[in-house]
Structure formats: structure tokens, C-alpha cells
Amino acid sequence: MVQQLSSLRGSSAEALQVLGEQVDGDRYTLEEFAALADDLFRAAALLRSEPALRRAVTDVSTPAEAKSSLVHGLLDGKLGAPAVDLLAQAVGLRWVAARDLADAVEHLGVVAAVRSAGRRESVRLSDELFVVAQVVEENAELRIALSDPVRSTDDKRELLRGLLAQRALPATVALVEQALAGSFRSFHAAVSEYQKVAAATQGEGVALVRVARELTEAERTRLEQALSTQYGRPVHLNIEVDPSLLGGMRVEIGDDVIDGTVVSRLDDARRRLAG
């Protein structure tokens, strides 16, 4: 089952689940998944840039067959058959808002990109996405360049290609580039969401762990095992070292937050004293 998008509600969420069958793990080869991801990202961009088209293919008063024919007429020969077939099916479903279709298509592209890495590389993909997000977050000059509205998307992609420079998986590169062109409020938000999708697609969870000092391998293993037992599935750790926490750790997994840092405990003590 494809991970749900929090922005989709009602019939849009149901439509995404129906379409998720088109990106099941055994449906295509890794190369075919990569091509599908690229096509879906291009389709999402087209839907966002053409409001009239977006409205036409989500108009509930237009028969599904007519909308499907419109998709085939526009995209046959321009995108691969799997992507066109998926889009033709998508426009026959009901969407709460016209923009939901583009968001769902992008999301399915992310899933396809994750599938293109293969299960053996799932941990590496998750790690690479985390590292890229951290590098950008910690490099003010790069962060400003990537958020500069004057710079073209192609220029920003060149900056990131230079950063990755043959070191990252093709799936990582595809997702990082899409993070610049998608619907998220920031590059960091996009990559963080893609990492969650990557974990969910491979049946894993992702825990963001903030600690005051580096964990030993034994400590990492114990924490990983404890969280995996608690959540009933493998949990991958992304660890941030922040000396300002003084000690302890803060764990975020999904909507759950476990804050056992010294700073948090001191803040609690101050509030109790003030009260």
C-alpha cells in the first residue's frame, strides 16, 4: 500500500490508494521504475503549469472516457506508456480539488523513484537523502542559492549535481532534483518527506534522533531494536548531534515525539518553579 499524503482527503485519498497499485514493487524492472518516475514528475509539472488542463481533466461533469482520451491524445509518444496509462486512469477518478491530482502524481513519482533503487539500496537511499538535507541546512550559502526565486530550477539542479558528483544513487539524484520543482514549501521539507516515503515504501520507519554526543554502535543498535519492537517494523535511525542539548536524546518518529534531553528536563523544572 502506498503511503498516504497528509494533504489529501476524502475521494482524493481514495484515488491515490487505487493508483498506488500501478507502482507496486514487482510490477516493473528498476530501470522501468526510474523511467516511470521521470515521466510522472514531468506530468505533475505539466498539470501545475497548465491550470486549464488541470481543470479539464478533473471536471466531474466530463465523462471519464473523454478525459482519458484527452490524456492519451496529449501524451502518447511524449511519455512512456505506463505513465500515460496511469494518468488516463487517474483522470477518471474523483478529486476533491484539482490540485490534488498533480500532488498525487508527484507522490507516485517519488514512490517509483524509490522503487528504482531496489530493496538492497533502500538504507543507502534513505541515508543519502538525510545527508543531502543536512548539508543544505547547514550551508547558508547553498541554502540561500536553492531558495533564490531569481535562479532557474536548472541552475539549482546544477548546483546539486556538483554536490552529489557521481557519489549518490541515481534515485537520490532524481529525488533531490524533484525537491526543487515540487509542491513543498522548502527543499528541506521536500527531502524530509521523500525520506519518509522511501522508508514507508520499503516497509520501514524513520526516526530522527537528536543527541548531545555521537552514539556508540552498541547504543545505536539498542535504540534501533527498541524502536523496531515498539512500532512493530524495522526503524531506520537518522542521528543529529547537537551539543546544546547537554545530554539525553529526542526521538521523532511519525507524529510521536519522545523528548528526554537534559535541556527539556531543565525547561520543565523551570516551568514548575515558575508556576
Swiss-Prot record:
Q: Which GO molecular function entries does the Swiss-Prot or TrEMBL record give?
A: proton-transporting ATP synthase activity, rotational mechanism
Keyword terms of this UniProt record: ATP synthesis, Cell membrane, CF(1), Hydrogen ion transport, Ion transport, Membrane, Transport
Annotated membrane topology is:
Peripheral membrane protein
Membrane recorded as keyword: yes
Q: List where in the cell it is found.
A: Cell membrane
Q: What is its main location?
A: membrane
Q: Does the keyword Ligase apply?
A: no
User: Which is a Gene Ontology cellular component entry for this protein?
Assistant: plasma membrane
Family matches, as PROSITE patterns:
ATPASE_DELTA
Which family does the UniProt entry place this protein in?
A: Belongs to the ATPase delta chain family.
Q: Which PANTHER family match?
A: ATP SYNTHASE DELTA CHAIN
Question: How does this chain assemble?
Answer: F-type ATPases have 2 components, F(1) - the catalytic core - and F(0) - the membrane proton channel. F(1) has five subunits: alpha(3), beta(3), gamma(1), delta(1), epsilon(1). F(0) has three main subunits: a(1), b(2) and c(10-14). The alpha and beta chains form an alternating ring which encloses part of the gamma chain. F(1) is attached to F(0) by a central stalk formed by the gamma and epsilon chains, while a peripheral stalk is formed by the delta and b chains.
Please explain the role this protein plays, according to its UniProt record: F(1)F(0) ATP synthase produces ATP from ADP in the presence of a proton or sodium gradient. F-type ATPases consist of two structural domains, F(1) containing the extramembraneous catalytic core and F(0) containing the membrane proton channel, linked together by a central stalk and a peripheral stalk. During catalysis, ATP synthesis in the catalytic domain of F(1) is coupled via a rotary mechanism of the central stalk subunits to proton translocation. This protein is part of the stalk that links CF(0) to CF(1). It either transmits conformational changes from CF(0) to CF(1) or is implicated in proton conduction.
Q: What is this protein called?
A: ATP synthase subunit delta
Q: Which organism is it from?
A: Nocardioides sp. (strain ATCC BAA-499 / JS614)
Q: What is the lineage of its organism?
A: Bacteria, Bacillati, Actinomycetota, Actinomycetes, Propionibacteriales
Q: Which gene encodes it?
A: atpH
